[in-house]
Amino acid sequence: LEILAETHGTRPDLTDQPIPDADHTWYTDGSSFLQEGQRKAGAAVTTETEVIWARALPAGTSAQRAELIALTQALKMAEGKRLNVYTDSRYAFATAHIHGEIYKRRGLLTSEGREIKNKSEILALLKALFLPKRLSIIHCLGHQKGDSAEARGNRLADQAAREAAIKAPPDTSTLLIEDSTPYTPAYFHYTETDLKKLRELGATYNQSQGYWVFQGKPVMPDQFVFELLDSLHRLTHLGYQKMKALLDRGESPYYMLNRDKTLQYVADSCTVCAQVNASKAKIGAGVRVRGHRPGTHWEIDFTEVKPGLYGYKYLLVFVDTFSGWVEAFPTKHETAKIVTKKLLEEIFPRFGMPQVLGTDNGPAFVSQVSQSVAKLLGIDWKLHCAYRPQSSGQVERMNRTIKETLTKLTLATGTRDWVLLLPLALYRARNTPGPHGLTPYEILYGAPPPLVNFHDPEMSKFTNSPSLQAHLQALQAVQREVWKPLAAAYQDQLDQPVIPHPFRVGDTVWVRRHQTKNLEPRWKGPYTVLLTTPTALKVDGISAWIHAAHVKAATTPPIRPSWRVQRSQNPLKIRLTRGAP
C-alpha cells in the first residue's frame, strides 16, 4: 500500500497511521438499506461520544456513495486542521489513498472504457483531500464489539447514519424541469470560492447542521443558486429586472450567494431570449465621407415612383456629396445597364470621371456589369451595409425631397405625369440652402441662378452678359472663397473622434433578421466575427458586411448536464446517468 500510495497517491503527506498531535479524531460511516420496499440511506461524522454531522441521503443511494459523502464532509469540516479520520469502508479508504488518483489519470473510466461509478463523489473527495492542514485516513473494522475508542466511534457513526436515514422527512423539494437536485441545506456543498465569499460576508458555520448561516438564513451555495435561477428562468423567460423584482417580493428561506450576479448571467446567456429580445446596445453615429471638390464623390440610388407616361416607374438619382447637386433620370427598368449608361453619357461628360461611387446592395449595383465598368474606369465603388439607409443618407434624403416635391406639383397642376414635372423638382432641390447656408447651385457656380422678370419693361438690361473671361475669374473666386472652406469643414467632421463598436474578431454575435415571418425570432445566429471596421462587421456564413447596429453580443450559454440511458445486464432494467453532454 505504501508503494502504491507513493506512486499513485493524490496527496504526498497523506498517511494511514494516526497523527499524534491531531486537532480532531473523527469517525465516518454511510448506511444504505431497504425498508418497506424503499432504499434509504444516510451518512454521519462523529467522535467517540458525539454526533458532529448526520444527514439523510436521496432514496436509492448506494452504501459506497454514502461512505464517500461522509468522508468528504469530514474533510471539509476539518479545513486547516490536523485530522485523524476513521472509516470502515475499504472502498472509501482505497479511493482516497490510491484508486481515486488512478481513476482521474484514466479519465474517470474503468479498464473496459466505461464511466466509473460515483464519479462526482470521487472528484469531490479528491478535491477535499487538500483542505486539512495534515491528514490521516485510517481503515478500521466494522461492527466491532470491543470497548476501544476505535470501536466506540465506529459504532456511533454507524448508528447515527442509520438513524438519519430512518428519520428522513418525506421529499418535499420543488419539482423543476430537467433538474431533480434537492434544494435543502442537507445537500449543500460549498466550494473554495463560496467559503471565501462567506468569510468576507461574516457568515457563521452551523457545525451541528453542516451549513453556513447569514442574516439568520441558511446560505445556498453559488452552484445551487445557479441551478435554481436557471430553472426558474427557463420556466418564465423573464428578464433580469422582472426576475429580480419577483425574487425581492418573495420571502426565500435561504440567502442566495451572488444572487444578482448569477441572475444577470442566466438572463444574458439564455439563447431563447437572445433570439427574441430587442438589443439594448447603442452604437455611436459614424461620420459620412464626402468628396473634396464637386464631381469626385457621388451617391446613387434607385427609387420607385408611381408609373408615369410611357411606363417610367423608376428614378435613378445621383447626388454629389460635396455640393449636394442632384441629377435624376426617369427609367423604365432597374438594371445595371441603365446605371452604366447614365454614368458614361450624363455624369462623365458634364462633371468628369468620378473617383468614388457609393450605393446600397441593390442588384443593379452589385451586378458584374456595374462593377466591371467601375474597375476599368478606376472608380472606387463602395457598397454600403445592407438595411442601413443612414449609410446612403444623402441620396436617401434627396429621394424623399424629390418625391414630396413631385407630389405637391401634381396636386397643384392637376397633371399625373411626374416625368413632365421632374425638372421643376430638380430646380427646387438644387436651389435649396444646405447645412452651411449655401445652395448646391451656389457652391457649383458661385452665384444664384439667373432669373428673368418677364414683366420688367426694360428687357435690354438682360441681353448683355459678362464676358467668358469674367466667368472664369468668378469661378476661380468660388474655388478660393467657397470650395476650400467647405472642404475644410467636411474634413473637420472626419477628424472628430468616433466611438467604435465593442465587437472584436472572434466574438460571437447575433444578427438582426430584417424580414421576419409570423412567430419567427428577430435574431439569427450566433455567428463568429471574422473582420471588423469602425462601423461594420464581417461574420462567417453571411457574405455582406453588417452594420454594428444590426448585431448584438451573444453570451456563451452554460453547459447543462443531460440525462443518458445505459444498458444493464438485466434486460428489465436501465441505468440513467446525468453528466455533461
From Swiss-Prot:
Residues 20-166 form the RNase H type-1 domain. Specific enzymatic cleavages in vivo yield mature proteins. InterPro entries: Gag-pol_Znf-H3C2, Integrase_cat-core, MLVIN_C, RNaseH-like_sf, RNaseH_domain, RNaseH_sf. Pfam families: MLVIN_C, RNase_H, rve, zf-H3C2. Coiled coil: none annotated. The gene is pol. Signal peptide: none annotated. GO terms for molecular function: nucleic acid binding; RNA-directed DNA polymerase activity; RNA-DNA hybrid ribonuclease activity. This protein is synthesized as a Gag-Pol polyprotein. Residues 290-448 form the Integrase catalytic domain. It comes from Radiation murine leukemia virus (strain Kaplan). Keywords: DNA integration, DNA recombination, Endonuclease, Hydrolase, Multifunctional enzyme, Nuclease, Nucleotidyltransferase, RNA-directed DNA polymerase, Transferase, Viral genome integration, Virus entry into host cell. Belongs to the retroviral Pol polyprotein family. GO terms for biological process: DNA integration; DNA recombination; establishment of integrated proviral latency; symbiont entry into host cell; viral genome integration into host DNA. It catalyses: Endonucleolytic cleavage to 5'-phosphomonoester; DNA(n) + a 2'-deoxyribonucleoside 5'-triphosphate = DNA(n+1) + diphosphate. This is Pol polyprotein.
